Protein backbone atom coordinates (compact mmCIF):
# COMPACT_ATOMS: atom_id res chain seq x y z
CA UNK A 1 0.00 0.00 0.00
CA UNK A 2 1.21 3.49 -0.86
CA UNK A 3 -0.13 6.70 0.68
CA UNK A 4 0.85 9.97 -0.96
CA UNK A 5 0.17 13.26 0.83
CA UNK A 6 -0.65 16.29 -1.35
CA UNK A 7 2.02 18.95 -1.85
CA UNK A 8 2.18 21.32 1.11
CA UNK A 9 3.94 24.26 -0.49
CA UNK A 10 3.12 26.62 -3.32
CA UNK A 11 4.82 26.07 -6.63
CA UNK A 12 4.95 22.27 -6.50
CA UNK A 13 2.93 21.84 -9.66
CA UNK A 14 4.79 21.01 -12.81
CA UNK A 15 4.45 23.28 -15.83
CA UNK A 16 2.95 21.37 -18.71
CA UNK A 17 5.22 20.41 -21.55
CA UNK A 18 4.75 19.86 -25.25
CA UNK A 19 1.58 17.77 -24.87
CA UNK A 20 -0.65 20.75 -24.07
CA UNK A 21 -1.99 23.93 -25.64
CA UNK A 22 -2.36 26.92 -23.31
CA UNK A 23 -1.53 27.09 -19.63
CA UNK A 24 -1.90 23.73 -17.90
CA UNK A 25 -0.60 22.70 -14.47
CA UNK A 26 -0.31 18.95 -13.76
CA UNK A 27 0.16 17.76 -10.17
CA UNK A 28 1.60 14.26 -9.96
CA UNK A 29 -0.75 12.60 -7.47
CA UNK A 30 0.79 9.13 -7.65
CA UNK A 31 4.00 8.31 -9.50
CA UNK A 32 3.77 5.49 -12.03
CA UNK A 33 2.93 2.32 -10.13
CA UNK A 34 2.34 -0.92 -12.01
CA UNK A 35 1.52 1.02 -15.20
CA UNK A 36 -0.97 3.35 -13.52
CA UNK A 37 -0.34 7.12 -13.31
CA UNK A 38 -2.64 9.47 -11.39
CA UNK A 39 -2.46 13.23 -11.95
CA UNK A 40 -4.63 16.13 -10.89
CA UNK A 41 -4.55 18.63 -13.75
CA UNK A 42 -5.59 22.30 -13.66
CA UNK A 43 -6.36 23.89 -17.04
CA UNK A 44 -6.77 27.64 -17.50
CA UNK A 45 -9.49 28.76 -19.95
CA UNK A 46 -8.68 27.34 -23.38
CA UNK A 47 -5.96 24.99 -22.08
CA UNK A 48 -6.21 21.44 -23.41
CA UNK A 49 -4.25 18.33 -24.28
CA UNK A 50 -2.89 17.32 -27.66
CA UNK A 51 -4.46 14.27 -29.30
CA UNK A 52 -3.36 11.15 -27.44
CA UNK A 53 -4.29 7.58 -26.56
CA UNK A 54 -3.71 5.23 -23.62
CA UNK A 55 -2.61 1.63 -23.88
CA UNK A 56 -5.21 0.40 -21.36
CA UNK A 57 -7.56 3.39 -21.22
CA UNK A 58 -8.01 6.50 -19.10
CA UNK A 59 -10.50 7.64 -16.46
CA UNK A 60 -11.13 11.35 -15.92
CA UNK A 61 -12.99 12.64 -12.86
CA UNK A 62 -13.98 16.30 -13.16
CA UNK A 63 -13.46 18.10 -9.86
CA UNK A 64 -14.24 21.72 -10.78
CA UNK A 65 -15.11 23.92 -13.73
CA UNK A 66 -16.32 23.17 -17.22
CA UNK A 67 -14.40 21.50 -20.01
CA UNK A 68 -14.51 19.76 -23.34
CA UNK A 69 -13.64 16.23 -24.43
CA UNK A 70 -13.64 14.58 -27.84
CA UNK A 71 -12.89 11.11 -29.15
CA UNK A 72 -11.66 10.99 -32.74
CA UNK A 73 -14.60 10.99 -35.14
CA UNK A 74 -17.07 11.88 -32.39
CA UNK A 75 -18.70 15.12 -31.26
CA UNK A 76 -17.13 17.50 -28.77
CA UNK A 77 -18.84 16.95 -25.40
CA UNK A 78 -19.14 19.37 -22.48
CA UNK A 79 -17.93 18.01 -19.13
CA UNK A 80 -18.65 19.47 -15.69
CA UNK A 81 -17.81 18.95 -12.02
CA UNK A 82 -18.99 15.50 -10.96
CA UNK A 83 -18.68 13.90 -14.41
CA UNK A 84 -16.59 10.76 -14.92
CA UNK A 85 -15.24 10.00 -18.40
CA UNK A 86 -13.90 6.65 -19.65
CA UNK A 87 -11.63 6.61 -22.72
CA UNK A 88 -11.26 2.96 -23.79
CA UNK A 89 -7.86 1.43 -24.61
CA UNK A 90 -6.37 2.92 -27.77
CA UNK A 91 -9.11 5.53 -28.28
CA UNK A 92 -7.62 8.73 -29.74
CA UNK A 93 -8.95 11.71 -27.80
CA UNK A 94 -8.25 15.11 -26.22
CA UNK A 95 -9.66 16.99 -23.23
CA UNK A 96 -9.31 20.29 -21.43
CA UNK A 97 -10.97 23.51 -20.30
CA UNK A 98 -13.71 25.29 -22.21
CA UNK A 99 -12.60 28.60 -23.78
CA UNK A 100 -14.31 30.57 -20.99
CA UNK A 101 -13.79 28.33 -17.93
CA UNK A 102 -11.13 26.77 -15.76
CA UNK A 103 -11.15 22.98 -15.40
CA UNK A 104 -9.63 20.69 -12.79
CA UNK A 105 -9.76 16.92 -13.19
CA UNK A 106 -8.08 13.83 -11.86
CA UNK A 107 -6.67 11.68 -14.67
CA UNK A 108 -6.05 7.99 -14.07
CA UNK A 109 -3.99 6.73 -17.01
CA UNK A 110 -3.54 3.01 -17.54
CA UNK A 111 -0.48 1.80 -19.42
CA UNK A 112 1.64 3.83 -21.82
CA UNK A 113 0.34 7.19 -23.09
CA UNK A 114 1.07 7.88 -26.78
CA UNK A 115 1.10 11.63 -27.43
CA UNK A 116 0.26 12.85 -30.93
CA UNK A 117 -0.26 16.19 -32.68
CA UNK A 118 -1.84 19.40 -31.40
CA UNK A 119 -5.62 19.80 -31.74
CA UNK A 120 -6.30 22.30 -34.54
CA UNK A 121 -7.84 25.57 -33.29
CA UNK A 122 -10.81 25.11 -35.63
CA UNK A 123 -11.49 21.67 -34.16
CA UNK A 124 -11.18 22.89 -30.55
CA UNK A 125 -13.56 25.81 -31.17
CA UNK A 126 -16.14 23.76 -33.08
CA UNK A 127 -19.68 23.64 -31.71
CA UNK A 128 -20.26 20.91 -29.15
CA UNK A 129 -23.00 18.31 -29.26
CA UNK A 130 -24.69 20.41 -26.55
CA UNK A 131 -24.61 23.54 -28.74
CA UNK A 132 -22.00 25.23 -26.53
CA UNK A 133 -18.49 26.36 -27.38
Language-model segments: what does each one mean?
Residues 23, 39-54, 89:
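Conserved short histidine dyad/triad with adjacent acidic residue
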Residues 42-44, 53-70, 108-111:
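Short, conserved beta-strand element in jelly-roll/cupin
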Residues 59, 86, 100-119:
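A short hydrophobic beta-strand segment most commonly corresponding to one strand
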Residues 96-98:
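Asparagine-centered strand-capping/turn motif at beta-strand->loop junctions
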